């Protein structure tokens, strides 16, 4: 399918909007009241530090709502204001933050139901309004909604759209797209739908496996089993790795994405030589600025003498998980929570370790003076960060020494 042509036709339709409806000022006032925080602004103005009693907070210098997230949420608010009576749906969570998604539900925005792992679009009728979230939506979903005669409000982050353009270039030049991402993440599902032939690698270990296969060959059945949920239909590693281009899920760990890109560049250079390798390899520049800034900020934060780290964001948020990884790699006790409600009485905290289910840890705040590093994912409002910080102050001051 010519996805580029379909996208162009859709964007020229009267039933498509990606610029909002002219209610930006009113919407931003509402979002400021609901999501911004005077306390967080105070901490910013105090060199990203705040001390009360025995607790000193060190806040990362880049954290929380990114421009793409703020834009998506604002467009969703505008959509409800512009269509006060119409049925409004969204194809997925607008962003990976439970409080924001719950706010949309309170505004009577319906979430497309999922049955046996498949979205049930039969609930959508002609004339309904359907929001595409910040992660985007697959080509097939857009086709379904377009065929139904829906008003489509597209809040896809421009950085995600940039990746789509990259994989479409790969497809046009008959290159396989190697996508650094999570095959079941909404963004990567959407990106792969715009690609031709593709392979999704989760991490550097998987990338090294593929690079070794490119250079030395291997067991095709083993390869296909290893990547059974992460490649295009009919993918053949013996045929489809001669010409490759690199793309990424925008929320992956920047350093790993860059390392994977360099790995494949060196692999193709080694296999095809300096004259021909450029025909076989397409480089990329699709690392999201906001993701990079937040990761750079936590790399700086973990240099401080921290007692512990609190990382705030949705548990299904990829960019938040990678912030957690950075702290753990520095051997800093780190707690990933999605709201202040996870901080429990009795010096207990309910949190999500990397790759594991929620657990409760006792005595997580040490006695005496402590320095707490705080950061949050790109989908986390400042108001949520404020609530977490205030609860840390309150619970620490209530602890009885001894």
UniProtKB/Swiss-Prot annotation:
CDD domains: lytB_ispH (cd13944). It comes from the Bacteria. [4Fe-4S] cluster binds at residues 66, 157, 288. GO terms for biological process: dimethylallyl diphosphate biosynthetic process; isopentenyl diphosphate biosynthetic process, methylerythritol 4-phosphate pathway; terpenoid biosynthetic process. (2E)-4-hydroxy-3-methylbut-2-enyl diphosphate binds at residues 96, 185, 250, 317-319, 379. Gene3D superfamilies: 3.40.50.11270, 4-hydroxy-3-methylbut-2-enyl diphosphate reductase, catalytic domain. It catalyses: isopentenyl diphosphate + 2 oxidized [2Fe-2S]-[ferredoxin] + H2O = (2E)-4-hydroxy-3-methylbut-2-enyl diphosphate + 2 reduced [2Fe-2S]-[ferredoxin] + 2 H(+); dimethylallyl diphosphate + 2 oxidized [2Fe-2S]-[ferredoxin] + H2O = (2E)-4-hydroxy-3-methylbut-2-enyl diphosphate + 2 reduced [2Fe-2S]-[ferredoxin] + 2 H(+). Binds 1 [4Fe-4S] cluster per subunit. Pathway: Isoprenoid biosynthesis; dimethylallyl diphosphate biosynthesis; dimethylallyl diphosphate from (2E)-4-hydroxy-3-methylbutenyl diphosphate: step 1/1; Isoprenoid biosynthesis; isopentenyl diphosphate biosynthesis via DXP pathway; isopentenyl diphosphate from 1-deoxy-D-xylulose 5-phosphate: step 6/6. It holds the Pfam family LYTB. GO terms for molecular function: 4 iron, 4 sulfur cluster binding; 4-hydroxy-3-methylbut-2-enyl diphosphate reductase activity; metal ion binding. Dimethylallyl diphosphate binds at residues 96, 185, 317-319, 379. The active site is at residue 187. Its cofactor is [4Fe-4S] cluster. Isopentenyl diphosphate binds at residues 96, 185, 317-319, 379. Its EC number is 1.17.7.4. Keywords: 4Fe-4S, Iron, Iron-sulfur, Isoprene biosynthesis, Metal-binding, Oxidoreductase. Catalyzes the conversion of 1-hydroxy-2-methyl-2-(E)-butenyl 4-diphosphate (HMBPP) into a mixture of isopentenyl diphosphate (IPP) and dimethylallyl diphosphate (DMAPP). Acts in the terminal step of the DOXP/MEP pathway for isoprenoid precursor biosynthesis. Belongs to the IspH family. PANTHER family: 4-HYDROXY-3-METHYLBUT-2-ENYL DIPHOSPHATE REDUCTASE, CHLOROPLASTIC. This is 4-hydroxy-3-methylbut-2-enyl diphosphate reductase. It comes from Microcystis aeruginosa (strain NIES-843 / IAM M-2473).
């Amino acid at each position: 399918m010519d996805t580029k042509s379909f996208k162009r036709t859709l964007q020229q339709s009267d039933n498509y909007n990606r610029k909002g409806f002219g209610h930006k000022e009113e919407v931003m006032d509402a979002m400021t009241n609901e999501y911004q925080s005077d306390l967080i602004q105070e901490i910013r103005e105090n060199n990203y530090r705040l001390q009360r009693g025995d607790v000193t907070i060190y806040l990362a210098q880049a954290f929380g709502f990114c421009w793409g997230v703020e834009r998506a949420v604002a467009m969703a608010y505008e959509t409800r204001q512009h269509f006060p009576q119409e049925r409004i749906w969204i194809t997925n969570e607008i962003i990976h933050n439970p409080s924001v998604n719950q706010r949309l539900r309170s505004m009577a925005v319906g979430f497309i139901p999922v049955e046996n792992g498949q979205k049930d679009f039969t609930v959508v009728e002609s004339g309904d309004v359907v929001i595409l979230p910040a992660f985007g939506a697959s080509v097939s979903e857009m086709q379904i909604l377009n065929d139904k005669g829906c008003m489509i409000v597209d809040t896809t982050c421009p950085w995600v759209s940039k990746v789509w353009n990259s994989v479409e270039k790969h497809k046009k030049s008959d290159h396989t797209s190697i996508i650094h991402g999570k095959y079941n993440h909404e963004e990567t599902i959407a990106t792969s739908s715009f690609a031709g032939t593709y392979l999704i690698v989760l991490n550097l270990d998987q990338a090294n496996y593929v690079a070794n296969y490119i250079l030395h060959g291997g067991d095709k059945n083993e390869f296909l089993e290893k990547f059974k949920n992460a490649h295009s239909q009919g993918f053949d590693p013996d045929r489809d790795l001669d010409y490759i281009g690199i793309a990424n899920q925008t929320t992956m760990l920047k350093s790993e994405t860059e390392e994977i890109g360099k790995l494949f560049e060196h692999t193709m250079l080694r296999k095809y030589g300096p004259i021909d390798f450029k025909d076989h390899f397409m480089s990329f520049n699709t690392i999201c600025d906001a993701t990079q800034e937040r990761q750079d900020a936590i790399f700086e934060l973990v240099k401080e003498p921290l007692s512990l780290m609190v990382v705030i964001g949705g548990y299904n948020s990829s960019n938040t998980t990678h912030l957690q990884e950075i702290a753990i790699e520095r051997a800093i006790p780190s707690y990933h929570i999605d709201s202040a409600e996870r901080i429990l009485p009795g010096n207990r905290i309910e949190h999500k370790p990397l790759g594991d289910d929620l657990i409760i840890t006792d005595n997580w705040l040490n006695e005496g003076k402590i320095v707490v590093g705080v950061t949050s994912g790109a989908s986390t409002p400042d108001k949520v960060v404020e609530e977490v910080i205030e609860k840390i102050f309150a619970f620490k001051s209530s602890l009885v020494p001894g």
